């Protein structure tokens, strides 16, 4: 079942946790590729110094953050890596969830950590060819190049590990907020 747009209107921290175990569907030249979401980070808009929309900063890059929840927000970091986010809440509350790691489906056996290609936000975008052309897409539409489904993969609260976000030291105390979530003991987690 495709997640409806209303799924993304909920509290961003809740959406970040609820996305764990859901399936990202990526339309490519070779068909639909699927990946289970393993790790996320919540970014809480104008009150969050780690968020691109902190203090209501509006730029060409952040335009998609000011759409209603359920749209994609893709930006470049370090001049070479793209990062995929899902916009949450409504256009009055520009918040998002960063997709930090996914597991390609169908799952493969006997993988080693050094062989993983989707255990980081830049790595997963490179692997699936996600770029700025994927910015602003409607994640609740099956016709979109990116959409998210619930395929009955159950995740209990005990399986979800909350911890500090990665790479946001510039945000002061907000860097320590426990807004990164990942599935306990999962091989594809980017950092423990």
From Swiss-Prot:
Question: What SUPFAM superfamilies does this protein map onto?
Answer: FMT C-terminal domain-like (SSF50486)
Task: List the CDD domains hit by this protein, alphabetically.
Answer: AAG
Keywords assigned: DNA damage, DNA repair, Hydrolase
Q: Name it.
A: Putative 3-methyladenine DNA glycosylase
EC number(s)?
3.2.2.-
Renumbered to this chain, the signal peptide range is: none
Stated family: Belongs to the DNA glycosylase MPG family.
Which HAMAP family is this protein grouped with? 3MGH
Keyword Secreted: yes or no?
A: no
One Gene Ontology molecular-function label: alkylbase DNA N-glycosylase activity
């Amino acid at each position: 079942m495709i997640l409806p747009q209303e799924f993304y209107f909920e509290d961003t921290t809740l959406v970040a946790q609820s996305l764990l175990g859901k399936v990202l569907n990526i339309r490519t030249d070779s068909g639909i590729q699927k990946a289970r979401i393993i790790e996320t980070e919540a970014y809480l808009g104008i009150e969050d110094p780690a968020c691109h929309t902190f203090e209501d900063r509006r730029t060409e890059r952040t335009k998609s953050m000011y759409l209603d929840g359920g749209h994609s927000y893709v930006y470049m970091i370090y001049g070479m890596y793209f990062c995929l986010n899902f916009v949450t809440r409504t256009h009055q509350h520009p918040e998002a969830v960063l997709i930090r790691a996914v597991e390609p489906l169908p799952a493969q056996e006997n993988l080693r950590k050094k062989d993983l290609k989707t255990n980081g936000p830049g790595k997963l975008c490179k692997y699936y060819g996600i770029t700025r052309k994927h910015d602003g897409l409607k994640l609740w539409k099956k016709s979109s190049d990116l959409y998210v489904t619930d395929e009955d993969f159950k995740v209990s609260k005990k399986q979800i590990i909350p911890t500090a976000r990665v790479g946001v030291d510039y945000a002061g105390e907000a860097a320590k907020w426990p807004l990164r979530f990942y599935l306990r003991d999962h091989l594809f987690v980017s950092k423990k």
